[in-house]
């Protein structure tokens, strides 16, 4: 009888653990304040990930809620402690505050979002203003702002509430403070890649890259890739980079169209369908490429152990499965 009770108790405890694990696997959104929400995604093993069904795969890697009017939404992934976020200020400016997973109640711990972090912001909406410790930076469409570690008071606002700014944000851990710097598309390192014949004619705009346009970063890299009309594939041939993780944020996706994002190990690929203004996490072990039912634009953001943009393991197209 005692053995039976003990077995039942252990089973109940295990079930409770699974329930909690499910909550923490990206399914539970928590409120930090009246307008800021966040969720946490834990790192995963490729041996496990290849067995995920569609719901679990999306729960771990897809980020559907990025841009919501009047809100700041963050996803905190344990892959390189990376933050993926969106802010859409309307009539009222929004302050970028820290979130619970980034601080404790201990003295001298991180109280401001960038006490131990750096931040990249790219605007994909109407004209907006980012204020960093009292200094205003106006960001037009596809203009970027790098904000260095130690900035305390950061707010975002739209110039016209009827045409609000859509600020897409990435943040990574930082060991040093570098100056805040705005970067326009003209100042970016603009690279033509692919061809229409290969269905991947595109322009890569390197915006927040260490050394580009006078920007210095600790580990954060961000940029925009625009596909030309008639092109549908991005990042093909595909690649991985074991020294960095990456995220993609898709936008300029026409109404009624979708993105078929491909992830996983090169011989164990899996599809994730995404809509306009949705994002996806790519672990260091995963390829990250996509085809759209129309051309589109996306923002890539990376963080990891080095700053060499071309440090990657290219996968030959015939090797993909």
Model-predicted regions and their roles:
Residues 76, 80, 216-279, 283-287, ...:
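Acidic/His-leaning functional-site neighborhoods
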Residues 25-104, 108-110, 118-119, 320:
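Hydrophobic, proline/glycine-rich low-complexity stretches
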Residues 113-141, 251-276:
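A short beta-strand-loop-beta hairpin characteristic of the jelly-roll/cupin
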Residues 161-179, 295-314:
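A short hydrophobic beta-strand segment most commonly corresponding to one strand
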Residues 157-221:
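Surface-exposed beta-loop interaction hotspot
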Residues 65-107, 202-246:
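A short glycine-rich, His/Asp/Glu-containing loop-to-beta-strand
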Residues 1-25:
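Bacterial Sec-dependent N-terminal signal peptides
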Residues 139-159, 273-294, 301-303:
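Conserved metal-binding segment of the jelly-roll/cupin
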């Amino acid at each position: 009888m005692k053995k039976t009770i003990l077995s039942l108790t252990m089973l109940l405890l295990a079930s409770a653990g699974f329930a909690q694990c499910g909550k923490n696997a990206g399914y539970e959104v928590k409120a930090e304040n009246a307008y800021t929400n966040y969720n946490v995604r834990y790192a995963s093993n490729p041996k496990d990930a290849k067995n995920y069904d569609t719901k679990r795969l999306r729960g771990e890697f897809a980020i559907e809620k990025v841009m919501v009017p009047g809100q700041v939404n963050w996803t905190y992934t344990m892959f390189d402690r990376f933050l993926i976020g969106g802010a859409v200020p309307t009539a009222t400016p929004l302050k970028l505050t820290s979130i619970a997973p980034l601080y404790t109640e201990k003295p001298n711990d991180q109280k401001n979002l960038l006490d131990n972090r750096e931040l990249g912001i790219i605007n994909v909406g109407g004209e907006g203003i980012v204020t960093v410790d009292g200094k205003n930076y106006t960001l037009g469409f596809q203009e970027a702002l790098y904000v260095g570690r130690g900035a305390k008071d950061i707010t975002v606002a739209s110039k016209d509430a009827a045409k609000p700014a859509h600020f897409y944000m990435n943040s990574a851990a930082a060991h040093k403070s570098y100056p805040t710097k705005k970067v326009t598309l003209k100042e970016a390192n603009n690279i033509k890649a692919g061809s229409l014949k290969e269905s991947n004619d595109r322009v890569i705009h390197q915006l927040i890259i260490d050394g580009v346009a006078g920007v210095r970063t600790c580990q954060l890299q961000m940029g925009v890739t625009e596909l030309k009309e008639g092109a549908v594939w991005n990042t093909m041939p595909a690649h991985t980079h074991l020294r960095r993780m990456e995220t993609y944020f898709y936008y300029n996706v026409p109404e009624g169209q979708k993105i078929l994002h491909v992830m996983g190990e090169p011989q164990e690929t899996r599809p994730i369908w995404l809509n306009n203004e949705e994002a996806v996490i790519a672990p260091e072990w995963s390829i990250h490429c996509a085809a759209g039912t129309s051309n589109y634009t996306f923002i890539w953001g990376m963080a990891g152990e080095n700053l060499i943009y071309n440090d990657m393991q290219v996968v030959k197209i015939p090797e993909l499965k």
